[in-house]
Amino acid sequence: MEYTLIIILILILGLLFTKRLNYKSKKANQLIVYNSTVLDVRSVLEFNRGHFKNSINIPLDLLSKNIDILKKESKPVVVVCSHGIRAASACTILKKNQIDCINGGSWNNLK
């Protein structure tokens, strides 16, 4: 009985998390439609294998050194990477520098 409750709880939490990710992707797509800057924080090699059209590539480890590039942008920034983890870290850096951004998750979600 206890295992059944635990499994049900895990399933419910999984569904809630998935809906939250879908919401973030939809919000990111809406921002792109309204003329935002797409920042891809994957490595140059990953970026060259495929990327969202017109996105800017600044790898996460170089972001702090290149923050001025994004400060010149007047548009919100949608940050993407391969799975959303590096994008979340990048958003933290951008927000500390007063740059409006959203974690767009995987760049594949924006296609």
Predicted regions mapped to residue ranges:
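Residue-level detector of flexible, active-site-proximal loop/helix-junction positions
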Residues: 45, 62-64, 108
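Helix-loop module immediately N-terminal to the HCX5R catalytic loop
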Residues: 56-76
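Short active-site oxyanion
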Residues: 32-37, 53-54, 75-77
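Flexible, polar/low-complexity N-terminal or interdomain linker segments that lie immediately upstream
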Residues: 1-49
